[in-house]
Curated annotation (Swiss-Prot):
Protein name per UniProt: ADM5
Domain of life: Eukaryota
Tissue specificity remark: Expressed abundantly in the spleen and thymus. Also expressed in adrenal and pituitary. Not expressed in brain, heart, kidney, liver and stomach.
Any single GO BP term: positive regulation of heart rate
Signal peptide region: 1-18
Function description: Seems to have a peripheral vasodepressor effect and a central vasopressor effect.
Sites of Tyrosine amide modification: 77
Gene Ontology CC annotations of this record: extracellular region
UniProt region (Disordered), positions on chain: 61-108
Places the protein is found: Secreted
Species annotation: Sus scrofa
Basic and acidic residues biased stretches: 90-101
Disulphide connectivity of cysteines: 38-43
Length: 108
């Protein structure tokens, strides 16, 4: 499906051509236009295998094990960090609330 759309786009752009190519261009205008596509569509047809390869590889990309976790997973990166921070905060709160630990901290 994507290849058909790509081929139709290439065909349409080669038929329509570049709208700015109707008149003569100065050197400055030519240097500015060097990054654009060719008016006859030859650049697109030469790059067609490269474009098709890129589209194919993008659609068949293998997922890595790191990215495959569900967002609800309790061991995902953000939840793991938040849980660790909560544990630290709870431990600090217990130290502050426990009088024996507070005296030991003040003495040391």
């Amino acid at each position: 499906m994507t290849a058909h759309i790509l081929l139709l786009w290439l065909f349409a752009s080669s038929i329509l051509g570049d709208p700015d190519s109707a008149g003569r261009l100065t050197r400055h205008q030519v240097s500015l236009k060097s990054g654009r596509l060719c008016s006859l569509g030859t650049c697109q047809t030469h790059r067609l295998p490269e474009i098709i390869y890129w589209l194919r590889s993008a659609s068949t990309k293998e997922l890595s094990g790191k990215a495959g976790r569900k967002p609800q997973d309790p061991y995902s990166y953000g939840r793991r960090r938040r849980r660790r921070r909560r544990r630290r905060e709870a431990r600090l709160l217990r130290r502050l609330q426990d009088p024996s630990l507070r005296r030991a901290q003040l003495a040391g």
